């Protein structure tokens, strides 16, 4: 741990003071693509786990600096309690955020994906099952603290954010916190350094998501072609090629880089609803398992149904908005993807009813 943290600090010092790398976005995509491809096929304990562990020090360091900035500067929050349901972050955009329901429940979507993350990575890093309790609950509390810090950062520079001067979420967060810290005497001269470190910390979070998501996408691509209980080692012919871990990783990474280079933001609006569909799937899996082992699963049925309803309503709104206000090819692509997700939601609802309410022989 000491050596790892020391190397991180040394690398940051070198990058900030002597040898910063200025590469194009496409070049960084290729570099990151190579990294996540390697991370996807190597055992968790070799690369993913130690990298996650060392990145956590950046997280805690960032949060400590942010808390010092908030309590030390006593910032005035100039954001109004309510603005409107229209996005004012980009001048003249006129993009509607939609109604409070279901937008609120598909915006706060970060928890849904972790049911999948736990299946392929978290479960391999637990010493015993009970360790999941403090990890899950502690992670939720830390995430809540980070959410409050983010609101404070946005509120502190709201007057600059509204006109469109600072538009990217990462820049908004880093600017707000670094300017708070600049108000504190012993941090007054370190605003640019703190800004860079905050950007680095956020980038490290994104990297943890990328390599884990690539591993999970590779799992799902392989399982798509396999029968229940079958592994890629049992497959033959073209199925053996499609389910090979290296081939599946290449397909996953290439598609990701292609989306990144061609305009992933065009379909990003569907992320929230599609992610909540995964939440419903996770709840269904746990409810089915509890029912199979003879334990009470009723506490999971309502949230599963709620997530399905929220997902379908949000997707229908998205489809309607893109069809009635189609401006380019991407509008129709979003409408088609949204329609497919609605179909998947209905299939999931049918499977859920059959699984949870079927009569025992």
Question: Which residue ranges define each predicted feature?
Answer:
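Transmembrane helix-loop boundary segments of multi-pass membrane transporters
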Residues: 1, 19-29, 46-55, 161-168, ...
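Hydrophobic, membrane-embedded alpha-helices of multi-pass small-molecule transporters
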Residues: 25-42, 68-75, 86-129, 133-138, ...
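Hydrophobic, small-residue-rich membrane helices and short re-entrant helix-turn-helix hairpins
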Residues: 42-56, 113-146, 165, 216-217, ...
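Hydrophobic alpha-helical segments of multi-pass membrane transport proteins
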Residues: 36, 59, 206-218, 252-256, ...
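Extracellular/periplasmic helix-exit of transmembrane alpha-helices
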Residues: 70-86, 138-177, 212
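Loop-to-transmembrane helix boundary motifs in multi-pass membrane proteins
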Residues: 138-145, 190-194, 223-261
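Select transmembrane alpha-helical segments in multipass membrane proteins
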Residues: 92-106, 148, 156-160, 185-205, ...
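Hydrophobic alpha-helical segments and their helix-loop junctions in multi-pass secondary transporters
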Residues: 6-30, 38-40, 44-45, 60-87, ...
């Amino acid at each position: 741990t000491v050596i790892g943290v020391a190397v991180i600090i040394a690398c940051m010092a070198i990058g900030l003071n002597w040898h910063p790398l200025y590469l194009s976005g496409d070049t960084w995509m290729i570099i990151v693509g190579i990294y996540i491809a390697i991370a996807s096929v190597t055992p968790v304990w070799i690369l993913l786990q130690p990298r996650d562990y060392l990145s956590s020090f950046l997280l805690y360091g960032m949060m400590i600096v942010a808390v010092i900035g908030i309590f030390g500067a006593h910032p005035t929050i100039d954001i109004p309690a309510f603005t409107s349901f229209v996005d004012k972050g980009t001048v003249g955009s006129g993009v509607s955020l939609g109604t409070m329901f279901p937008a609120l429940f598909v915006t706060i979507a970060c928890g849904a994906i972790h049911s999948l993350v736990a299946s392929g990575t978290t479960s391999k890093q637990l010493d015993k099952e009970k360790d999941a309790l403090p990890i899950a609950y502690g992670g939720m509390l830390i995430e809540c603290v980070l959410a409050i810090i983010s609101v404070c950062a946005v509120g502190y520079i709201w007057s600059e954010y509204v006109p469109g001067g600072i538009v990217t979420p990462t820049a908004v967060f880093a600017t707000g916190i670094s300017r708070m810290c600049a108000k504190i005497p012993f941090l007054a001269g370190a605003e640019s350094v703190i800004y860079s470190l905050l950007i680095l910390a956020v980038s490290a979070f994104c990297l943890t998501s990328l390599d884990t998501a690539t591993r999970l996408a590779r799992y799902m691509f392989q399982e798509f072609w396999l029968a229940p209980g079958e592994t890629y080692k049992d497959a033959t012919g073209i199925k053996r090629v499609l389910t090979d871990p290296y081939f599946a990783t290449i397909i996953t990474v290439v598609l990701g880089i292609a989306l990144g280079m061609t305009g992933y933001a065009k379909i990003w609006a569907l992320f929230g609803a599609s992610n909540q569909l995964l939440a419903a799937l996770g709840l269904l899996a746990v409810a089915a398992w509890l029912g199979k082992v003879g334990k009470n699963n009723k506490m999971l049925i309502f949230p599963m149904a709620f997530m399905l309803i929220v997902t379908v309503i949000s997707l229908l709104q998205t489809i309607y908005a893109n069809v009635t206000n189609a401006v380019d090819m991407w509008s129709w692509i979003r409408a088609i993807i949204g329609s497919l997700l609605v179909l998947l939601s209905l299939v999931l609802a049918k499977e859920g009813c059959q699984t949870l309410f079927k009569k025992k022989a």
